[in-house]
Amino acid sequence: YVGKKGIVFTRYADDLTLLAPTAEAMRFMLKVCSDYATEFSIMFNPNKTKCMLFRPMGKPVDVYPTFYINGSHIDYVNEWMHLGNIIDVNQSDSACIINRRNRLIGQINDVLCFFSKLDSYTKTKLLYAYCSSFYGSVLWDLQRFEIQRLCSAWRTALRRVWRVPRNTHCNIVAALSNRLPLYDELCNRTINFHYGCLKSKNCVIRNLANYMMCDEGAQSPHGRNIRFICSEFNLSFSAFSKLTCHIEVTSFFQRNRYDRLYDFDTSRFNVLLEMLMIKDGVFDLQYFSNDDVEAIINDICTDEH
């Protein structure tokens, strides 16, 4: 139960998830599935059917109930890939985020290798096109340390794309891409996801989104994320209960983050862009040697002022 609403199954395409508070309730639902499969001559694949036992934090499990589907035994797992996201019995996002980070690094290397001869601006566009999906990230705990490791890998990729020093200031790295820093982007996606749930045509999803805004629901992972975003970025928590506030909240968030991002000398940043274009061969400047260009780039990227 979530509040007073019982949610016992979810479905996406041919993927079905059953949720039950007791073993007996699970057996009842599995029987319904088996009877349906028999009636309509379909089969559930036992090799792709797994069981996960979620327990109260810190409490050991003494007994694992036995379940069957279509006469086949269902195995237990501690984690499982579901629609591209790893679900863990400990209700932790760590494995999912680390897995996404590892996949991201592989994608980045492929893009930078395949498009190595293109200029930095074009490679940045391709990097976002091929590597920035982050499907399922709206469900992550935004306070997990592993997210910072993911963001660090993304900043490293941008530094490689623009061929700037490894200690280039983070705000300059983000400004070069003319996008929000990755962490801010993940927060922005969570905001849009929340309002998307509020206006969903599915009444279950709408009810869940509204429940997250009450005191009890705010202790859930998504509720904690919304409270964290409000605290971190000075947003009104009550605004997340009103669908009419969507544009206002996202506009304020993005404007606030861009103002913080460009808190450096923009004239020096424009010089940096020109030097990087010269380095890429897009611009030509006869009176500066390659060493001069590198020196200017290094000075602007790492200057403390």
Task: Name these PLM-found stretches.
Residues Y1-G6, D119:
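Short helix/loop segment immediately N-terminal to the Walker
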Residues V2-K4, I69, H82:
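Structural motif
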Residues I7-E39, P56-G58, D88-D93:
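Catalytic palm subdomain of template-directed nucleic-acid polymerases
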Residues V8-R11, D75-E79:
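Short, flexible turn/loop "capping" segments at secondary-structure junctions
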Residues A13-D14, N45-K50, F54-M57, M81-L208:
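Non-catalytic, peripheral interaction segments enriched in hydrophobic/basic residues
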Residues Y36-M43, V164:
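Secondary-structure transition/capping motifs at alpha-helix termini
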Residues M43-N78:
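Short, conserved micro-motifs composed of acidic
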Residues N47, S137, D141-L142, G196-H305:
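Charged boundary/loop elements
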